[in-house]
């Protein structure tokens, strides 16, 4: 039997007792959708590791957070005024957080993260663009983790880098480095 799975399957990595699940942008686009995600996780405790996308479209003509972040990064790279674009992103997260009764603290954390990313080095525009765009998933994960905790589920936000995910530095063609897979198995130990 050929196993093309990049994760070693052995006594420490029993895929039958733990599930890793990914929820796309539509699944985390609104508070109502995040509540559905929570229901799925609550109903099946074997879902131990959750990966989420940036909030997607809530309705047909809506704008995805990723598209907002692309506009924000482009404006920043061109040296244009960015406050309106930044407010648009923060407001989307604030709407979700408010509807989940999460309070202002999580929004302050997200705003600080976005401002830190916007103030980062722009000498490599592609890398700047990628790291700002990646904030969509990262900040979505923060909201989901806080919400899950608020309803009594054990949840912990883990930054992908802290989890062991290492990537190349090819702008807009980022891929996980092979050594990431062994590092990510340590995440299973925590789950």
Model-derived features with residue positions:
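Nucleotide/pyrophosphate-binding catalytic subdomain
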Residues: 7-191
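Short hydrophobic transmembrane-like helices used for membrane targeting/insertion
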Residues: 1-2, 9
């Amino acid at each position: 039997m050929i196993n093309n799975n990049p994760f070693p399957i052995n006594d420490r990595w029993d895929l039958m007792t733990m599930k890793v699940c990914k929820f796309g942008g539509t699944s985390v686009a609104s508070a109502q959708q995040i509540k559905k995600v929570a229901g799925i996780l609550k109903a099946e405790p074997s879902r131990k590791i959750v990966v989420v996308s940036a909030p997607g479209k809530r309705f047909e003509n809506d704008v995805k957070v990723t598209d907002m972040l692309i506009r924000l990064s482009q404006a920043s790279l061109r040296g244009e005024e960015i406050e309106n674009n930044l407010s648009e992103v923060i407001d989307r997260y604030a709407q979700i957080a408010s509807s989940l009764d999460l309070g202002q603290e999580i929004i302050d954390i997200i705003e600080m993260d976005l401002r830190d990313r916007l103030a980062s080095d722009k000498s490599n525009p592609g890398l700047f663009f990628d790291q700002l765009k990646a904030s969509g998933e990262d900040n979505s994960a923060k909201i989901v983790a806080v919400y899950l905790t608020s309803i009594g589920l054990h949840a912990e936000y883990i930054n992908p880098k802290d989890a062991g995910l290492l990537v190349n530095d090819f702008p807009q063609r980022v891929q996980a480095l092979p050594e990431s897979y062994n590092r990510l198995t340590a995440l299973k130990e925590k789950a």
